[in-house]
Amino acid sequence: MIGLIQRVREARVEVDGVVVGRTGRGLLALIGVQRDDDEPQARRLLERILGYRVFPDEAGRMNRSVRDIGGGLLLVPQFTLAADTRKGMRASFAPAASPERGEALFHRLLGLARESGVPVEAGRFAADMQVHLINDGPVTFWLEARPSAA
């Protein structure tokens, strides 16, 4: 499972001109679900998103997490993150989870996030969304939670 996190001053996501999710200071996390992902990857990715230190402390060092600052989290499903772009001029979506599986795992991640105590809102799975953000920094990180080798 992939999370592209961006430190934001504010962000919102719209569907058909209607705001379906927003946050003030916090994180915008674009989420890609891969074919072999399952609940352990959702749990691990969320743990990393909520604990990743991307906000400055008193000395200006990135030593605080979204939890530490009392920030919000906007989760947006984005299946294109799971694409294979290593060859050619067109992405292959073979590594991505099926739409049904991707939606189920995204909603599981969202449910876990809502249980975390951090204010959470979300985009809509498989919708044509417009994402607006004021990126703070910019600060952007690619996080992954991969299945363990059996």
Curated annotation (Swiss-Prot):
Function as written in the Swiss-Prot or TrEMBL entry: An aminoacyl-tRNA editing enzyme that deacylates mischarged D-aminoacyl-tRNAs. Also deacylates mischarged glycyl-tRNA(Ala), protecting cells against glycine mischarging by AlaRS. Acts via tRNA-based rather than protein-based catalysis; rejects L-amino acids rather than detecting D-amino acids in the active site. By recycling D-aminoacyl-tRNA to D-amino acids and free tRNA molecules, this enzyme counteracts the toxicity associated with the formation of D-aminoacyl-tRNA entities in vivo and helps enforce protein L-homochirality.
Family note: Belongs to the DTD family.
EC number: 3.1.1.96
Protein name, per record: D-aminoacyl-tRNA deacylase
Name of a matching Pfam family: Tyr_Deacylase
Chief place where the protein resides: cytoplasm
InterPro entries (alphabetical): Daa-tRNA_deacyls_DTD (IPR003732), DTD-like_sf (IPR023509)
Organism of origin: Alkalilimnicola ehrlichii (strain ATCC BAA-1101 / DSM 17681 / MLHE-1)
Residue interval(s) of motif Gly-cisPro motif, important for rejection of L-amino acids: 137-138
Cell location: Cytoplasm
Subunit structure: Homodimer.
Record note on domains: A Gly-cisPro motif from one monomer fits into the active site of the other monomer to allow specific chiral rejection of L-amino acids.
Catalytic activity: glycyl-tRNA(Ala) + H2O = tRNA(Ala) + glycine + H(+); a D-aminoacyl-tRNA + H2O = a tRNA + a D-alpha-amino acid + H(+)
Keyword tRNA-binding: yes
Annotated GO biological process: D-amino acid catabolic process
Keywords assigned: Cytoplasm, Hydrolase, RNA-binding, tRNA-binding
One of the record's GO molecular function terms: D-tyrosyl-tRNA(Tyr) deacylase activity
Keyword Kinase found: no
Cellular component GO terms, alphabetical: cytoplasm
EC category name: hydrolase
